């Protein structure tokens, strides 16, 4: 046959993944739903004193993109929170107006165009499709005709599909079938592309700010409302997309995202798996000290972080007044 032993094993597991995910492109898997439940559960457990500390603040506002995966994420996250904190009242909202800032796409989508061109240029000079094909196929002469001549496109599609396996209920990481060198080159191509498409790249110096601004304005306004003395808001939650979250954290300049890098500088200095994996989230957690100051700390993917450009007030905490001024000035 045309398949080597590695090719047969890859094809076997790929078939299971394809059958499981038939008709579900872009949807949340059961594994993803479980992870969102866990994030909500951990938030409730970690900040139980905050949720229980004010008997008048009982409303949890939940806003989601209209995307089905975001709606299910919202449901599962709040299920986890409910199991930890009793007595809260949940308000669920979605709609086109909310999608507009939770998944903002400027036209033309310059980030996708520029990053895609950079990725394919890298692949044509650095990637090793022949090694990958020889690993999976006993004969490779037919591949160029089969894919219309673009072997780099075919290699990219194989890699992208292999990345999906570990996200499914089957849970098999198909990348383990890749030889080391082609695996590394494929990761480098995609990793640098993510940065150029959505972060503080030198190629697109204003893109992150352009995408993040509508969402950041909403965040500031909703925090201001929640912090009013007569507010009943215990938490205000948004469920959106990585294509907006990554520009947001880049524009804000949290640790690990504030550098401005070119496509060629990204690998070795930044890892997409650390900053924009499935279920990525940013949390602003508010406190009031004995002097009445409103303090806030930032968590990214449930770990405390900071903004190197803005000095904290004490430990991981900012005065909200200072952080608010910084954020407002960044979009003014």
Each model region followed by its residue ranges:
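Signature for phosphate-centric chemistry
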Residues: 1-61, 65-236, 240-332
